[in-house]
Regions:
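Solvent-exposed loop/turn segments at secondary-structure junctions
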Residues: 111-114, 159-163, 185-190, 204-207, ...
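Active-site histidine-acidic residue metal-binding/catalytic motifs
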Residues: 92-169, 175, 189
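Active-site-adjacent mobile loop/cap segments within catalytic or ligand-binding domains
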Residues: 182, 200, 229-287
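A short, glycine/acidic-enriched catalytic loop
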Residues: 116-129, 188-213
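Active-site-adjacent substrate-binding region
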Residues: 206-229
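SH3/SH3-like beta-barrel superfamily modules
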Residues: 51-87
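Intrinsically disordered, low-complexity Ser/Thr-rich linker and spacer segments
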Residues: 30-32, 36, 44-45, 86-103, ...
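Hydrophobic membrane-insertion alpha-helices, especially the h-region
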Residues: 10-28
Length: 287
């Protein structure tokens, strides 16, 4: 009788312990993830500028923290590494690793809502074509192509809404973006006076390097590449991250607008931008 009572007590003590161990095991397994080197480079810190760590073709890690949309991982129970959270969630989205798949990019479609920006006027029926329409169309194309490369893309606006200037660079600062790029279309005092594309930077260093790298890709556009220039624009001036503003043609010049309005031109610009951003991120990536 006493032996039966003791066994019952023992089981009453062991059951909570076993349940706790099962819960710990389940939580641990839930936070474990397999990392494929072909898809993700593990780094020493939360960003693509940190040096990579040595890794096997396949690693098993446990998520132990998060910073700037990067997961902190414990690899093989001893080594600490970092990886972009958005890539860990779907490693099959991009076949192989590339610099853009580690990058956070803020895309700013200039103007919007009650702020229409510059305009092109068609004198035949006197309709007006607004800058805000074409900056958004271009921004969406660039965003789509960047996401296809695995990049984390944040848009300051994704519809025809008004967004004040000051919050736009704040989005880049808050997300620790690797790149901030703002799209606009230029305008001259008189119609048909100006033509061409210009890339502006405000800060020297990474921002100027970004301007040079992206602008170099515009040499084969149907509009003349006017090069890079210093520009005192709030969205790039009040920006803590690498930031540029691209004027992709004069909207009030008929020759330029005939390009600006076409899907072909927008697609060509988007391809050039993605190529330039990939090159910039490759140059910035920790070695």
């Amino acid at each position: 009788m006493q032996a039966t009572f003791n066994r019952r007590q023992l089981w009453l003590c062991l059951v909570p312990l076993l349940l706790a161990l099962c819960l710990i095991f389940a939580v641990t397994k839930q936070n474990q993830i397999t990392i494929h080197k072909s898809a993700i480079i593990l780094r020493q810190g939360p960003g693509l500028t940190y040096a990579p760590i040595k890794q096997s073709a396949t690693e098993t890690g446990q998520i132990i923290g998060q910073q700037n949309s990067w997961y902190k991982l414990r690899i093989d129970d001893h080594q600490v590494a970092w990886a972009p959270a958005w890539r860990l969630k779907d490693q099959t989205k991009v076949g192989t690793h590339n610099a853009l798949s580690e990058a956070t990019i803020v895309i700013d479609a200039g103007h919007g809502g009650s702020d229409s920006g510059a305009e092109y006027h068609d004198n035949s029926n006197n309709p007006k074509y607004m800058e805000k329409t074409y900056t958004l169309a271009l921004a969406k194309r660039v965003a789509s192509k960047l996401r296809a490369q695995g990049a984390r893309v944040i848009m300051t606006r994704d519809n025809d809404q008004y967004v004040a200037l000051k919050p736009r660079p704040k989005m880049a600062e808050k997300t620790k973006a690797d790149v901030f790029i703002s799209f606009h279309y230029d305008s001259s005092p008189q119609a048909n006076e100006g033509s061409g594309v210009t890339t502006y930077y405000y800060h020297r260093g990474p921002s100027k390097e970004l301007a040079q790298t992206v602008n170099h890709q515009f040499n084969h556009l149907p509009l003349k590449n006017l090069g890079i220039n210093f520009g005192d624009f709030l969205v790039i001036r009040d920006n803590t991250q690498p930031a540029i503003l691209c004027e992709m043609g004069y909207i009030n010049t008929k020759r330029d607008f005939q390009q600006i309005k076409t899907a072909r031109y927008q697609n060509q610009v988007a391809n050039d931008v993605v190529t330039g951003l990939n090159q910039f991120c490759q140059n910035r990536a920790g070695k």
